[in-house]
């Protein structure tokens, strides 16, 4: 979406029952082995900093059904944002053979996330508006996206909720992952 979509989204969401709303800064670094072992397995590994808390997350291969992305993920609280160890990685997922090389940072994302937890129909839907940047070496790319997560309830409620969005252009659905 375009950056001016934030105000439109915020105004639109005010017509629904908002259970929670907050803005946080998220710093993420994504890691893989030099041979791209994790990417070849359709997995992603990141360290996320949220305030003073750090979480190691492994996202495994998922599925896309009707445009809805479902991807299992495993989390581990860690003390800092240093390069994840083999021990940490194997505590998240039962890998059979990991490369002997050290994990290396691939890229980072820094963004502000404003999220709303909305009661809609028989469901709870999280709406997140992310605005920031992707960093890889000397290159940067802006991030400006809206994400929806069905926290509880019916997939049909999620699709109905999204169909009510006030955007007619500059918006597209994607199951792409960072």
Q: Which ranges hold each PLM region?
A:
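Phosphate-end processing signature that detects enzymes handling 5′-triphosphorylated RNA
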Residues: 1-178
């Amino acid at each position: 979406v375009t950056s001016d979509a934030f105000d439109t989204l915020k105004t639109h969401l005010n017509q629904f029952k908002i259970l929670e709303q907050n803005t946080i800064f998220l710093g993420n670094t994504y890691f893989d082995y030099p041979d791209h072992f994790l990417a070849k397995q359709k997995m992603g590994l990141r360290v996320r900093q949220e305030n003073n808390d750090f979480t190691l997350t492994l996202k495994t291969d998922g599925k896309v059904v009707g445009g809805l992305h479902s991807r299992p993920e495993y989390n581990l609280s860690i003390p800092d944002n240093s390069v994840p160890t083999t021990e940490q990685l194997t505590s998240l997922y039962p890998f059979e053979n990991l490369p002997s090389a050290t994990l290396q940072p691939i890229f980072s994302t820094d963004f502000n996330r404003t999220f709303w937890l909305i009661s809609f129909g028989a469901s709870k839907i999280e709406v997140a508006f992310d605005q920031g940047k992707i960093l890889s070496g000397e290159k940067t790319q802006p991030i400006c996206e809206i994400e929806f997560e069905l926290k509880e309830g019916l997939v049909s409620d999620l699709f109905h909720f999204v169909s009510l969005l006030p955007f007619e252009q500059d918006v597209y659905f994607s199951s792409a992952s960072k």
